[in-house]
Amino acid sequence: MAELTISSDEIRSAIANYTSSYSAEASREEVGVVISAADGIAQVSGLPSVMANELLEFPGGVIGVAQNLDTDSVGVVVLGNYELLKEGDQVRRTGDVLSIPVGEKFLGRVINPLGQPIDGLGEIVAEEDRVLELQAPSVLERQPVEEPMATGIKAIDAMTPIGRGQRQLIIGDRKTGKTAVCVDTILNQKANWETGDKTKQVRCIYVAIGQKGSTIAALRKTLEEQGALEYTTIVAAPASDAAGFKWLAPFAGAALAQHWMYQGNHVLVIYDDLTKQAEAYRAISLLLRRPPGREAYPGDVFYLHSRLLERAAKLSDDLGAGSITALPIIETKANDVSAFIPTNVISITDGQVFLESDLFNRGVRPAINVGISVSRVGGAAQTKGMKKVAGSLRLDLAAYRDLEAFATFASDLDAASKAQLERGQRLVQLLIQSENAPQAVEYQIISLWLAGEGAFDNVPVDDVRRFETELHEYLGSNAPQVYEQIAGGAVLSDESKETLLQATEQFKGTFQTTDGTRIINEPEVDALDAGQVRKDQLTVSRKVGK
């Protein structure tokens, strides 16, 4: 049996190492206790050093955001299943302010407001974390909005143009096509994305707030089928989620957008819709016992939307010249744009596109009321070619609306009024577009210019849209150089105008209307003078009664 030897030097060395690493200082950890938990809100006692918007950790991995910082308790918005919490549970500080992971890999994915994937396609590799409540760019960090953000919708691109870095409100009653306008705008960015040019490409973020899960799934399917999902991220806070997720979803979309903007990219963010976010924030505020104001909204609901939408900007060249274009959606009731939330957001944004249920029900889609829709950026965000042809369009349509109202009471109209009425009817038809069918700017310019020149005046009203579609197919084969010229940013030259008019007249000879006839331009005949009439050759026919 081996002899046991003990080295006193080794024992002394081990004790010395242990005692030298020992610290007499006690570690401090703040721990709170749940007083109550109900309706997505937890009241927590303790945590005297907690920060506003700090993440707190509950048992079972549930997290919350500190909101009300009272002297003896903290009001916490629970981001998860609050039913798992019970009185007496311990709550720990994390020291982190609410943030989400961001990065290029988020394109093509569906995430929740915490940046976690919910599409079943696996984890997302993030580049970094970005704070949700980030400060908007200052005045000196911005530059004027001058680059167009084409939507592919003639009525918007011509009369209420949107520029990169602008905030344009889409407002209207439910079921008037608000989401369709925004989805078409996303689809219209496909051609720019395929160029591979960073200065042309637009990354899109669609924030779905309080919508049905089936609606979000259908939208994702549409984007995927149209080839637009590869440059789009969907931030989803469906109706089944807690109010806290609906409140945070727009800020998550804005944080992801700012990450790309500061890299010099162009981003389009759609908030669908901010009415539901305001309602969720109202519910949270009332549950936190904050004093209600107008329509029971809290006093800082204006600040809720202003600090979100101010993050949309066109950055200066020194910061990379990136941009965020915001399209917030607001749902009205009975076309009442004077309600609290609509007036708030109208005052924050750079213009609004108003969709009207009456127009929608009459088949005018997109149902844009051009009378009260406006863009405060205006022609600065239009190409030269579009600015040239769209100048009189709004006036022509406004005059048509007035004349249309008058014509319902007047029995006789003079020839000029009749001509204006008929052209207005054709302009309205020309501005109607199918869903998920955005139109390139060069096609819009050619259609609007030809309409202004009277090329559609003798086309039956019911055939205007089909005539336009088939005309573009014909012009694409017979005058492709005109499309290339406009796409390059040039205005229509006199030679191009002549080419378009001649080609249109040739096409009219082949176009067949719905009733099977052809469009024939009858030559103008001058009236005969009295001396030219041969009275002796006139034949008088008399109708003889039976």
Curated annotation (Swiss-Prot):
Reaction it catalyzes: ATP + H2O + 4 H(+)(in) = ADP + phosphate + 5 H(+)(out)
Keyword vocabulary terms for this entry: ATP synthesis, ATP-binding, Cell membrane, CF(1), Hydrogen ion transport, Ion transport, Membrane, Nucleotide-binding, Translocase, Transport
Species assigned in the record: Corynebacterium efficiens (strain DSM 44549 / YS-314 / AJ 12310 / JCM 11189 / NBRC 100395)
HAMAP family: ATP_synth_alpha_bact (MF_01346)
PROSITE patterns: ATPASE_ALPHA_BETA
Nucleus keyword on record: no
Function (record text): Produces ATP from ADP in the presence of a proton gradient across the membrane. The alpha chain is a regulatory subunit.
Family classification: Belongs to the ATPase alpha/beta chains family.
Membrane topology, as annotated: Peripheral membrane protein
This protein's name: ATP synthase subunit alpha
Quaternary structure annotation from Swiss-Prot or TrEMBL: F-type ATPases have 2 components, CF(1) - the catalytic core - and CF(0) - the membrane proton channel. CF(1) has five subunits: alpha(3), beta(3), gamma(1), delta(1), epsilon(1). CF(0) has three main subunits: a(1), b(2) and c(9-12). The alpha and beta chains form an alternating ring which encloses part of the gamma chain. CF(1) is attached to CF(0) by a central stalk formed by the gamma and epsilon chains, while a peripheral stalk is formed by the delta and b chains.
Gene Ontology CC annotations of this record: plasma membrane; proton-transporting ATP synthase complex
Its EC number(s): 7.1.2.2
Binding residue positions for ATP: G172, D173, R174, K175, T176, G177, K178, T179
Residues marked Required for activity (site): S373
Cysteine-cysteine disulfides: none
GO molecular function, one term: ATP binding
